[in-house]
From Swiss-Prot:
The gene is mnhB2. The keyword Transport applies. GO terms for biological process: monoatomic ion transport. This is Putative antiporter subunit mnhB2. The keyword Cell wall biogenesis/degradation does not apply. Keywords: Antiport, Cell membrane, Ion transport, Membrane, Transmembrane, Transmembrane helix, Transport. It comes from Staphylococcus epidermidis (strain ATCC 35984 / DSM 28319 / BCRC 17069 / CCUG 31568 / BM 3577 / RP62A). Belongs to the CPA3 antiporters (TC 2.A.63) subunit B family. The chain crosses the membrane at residues 10-30, 35-55, 70-90, 116-136. It comes from the Bacteria. The lineage of its organism: Bacteria, Bacillati, Bacillota, Bacilli, Bacillales. InterPro entries: CPA3_antiporter_subunitB, MnhB. It is a multi-pass membrane protein. One of its GO terms (molecular function) is antiporter activity. PANTHER family: NA(+)/H(+) ANTIPORTER SUBUNIT B, NA(+)_H(+) ANTIPORTER SUBUNIT B.
Length: 141
């Protein structure tokens, strides 16, 4: 965008923070409530797209050290690995494993492999959506 739209840029900074925060919430609440990796990925993607609309695409891509094509591939590999590794241990495809772990700062945390699978979905969705939008807009993807 070549115009200096101060209001749009100022509001975008606030809204992007809100979108990313809400995306984290939806992602982490998703295995027990509606949400998860797909919806969280859509919310994250909308934050990136809003930044591309408010600021210059090349300027945003220079400031973000993210290659969205690699992000898409990494997310797909995480999801496939999380889904298929249990088969090597005689368990069915997409078998869920749970553990209760105590971290020094966080305390007692309930951890599942579903969260890792959903992380792969989130990264894949963000990578695909942003790459498609950059390809459509003619920006570097």
């Amino acid at each position: 965008m070549k115009e200096n739209d101060v209001v749009l840029k100022s509001v975008t900074k606030i809204v992007v923070f809100i979108l990313l925060t809400f995306g984290f919430y939806v992602f982490f609440a998703g295995h027990n409530n509606p949400g998860g990796g797909f919806i969280g990925g859509l919310i994250f993607s909308s934050a990136f797209i809003l930044m591309f609309l408010a600021f210059d695409v090349n300027e945003v891509l220079k400031s973000l050290p993210i290659d969205f094509k690699k992000l898409m591939i990494i997310g797909s590999l995480i999801s496939v690995a999380t889904a298929s590794v249990p088969m090597f241990f005689g368990k069915p495809f997409l078998y869920q494993t749970e553990a209760n772990v105590t971290f020094p700062l966080l305390g007692h945390v309930h951890v599942t492999t579903v969260t890792l699978f959903e992380l792969g979905i989130l990264l894949t969705v963000v990578g695909v959506i942003v790459t498609v939008m950059l390809s459509i807009s003619g920006g570097r993807s």
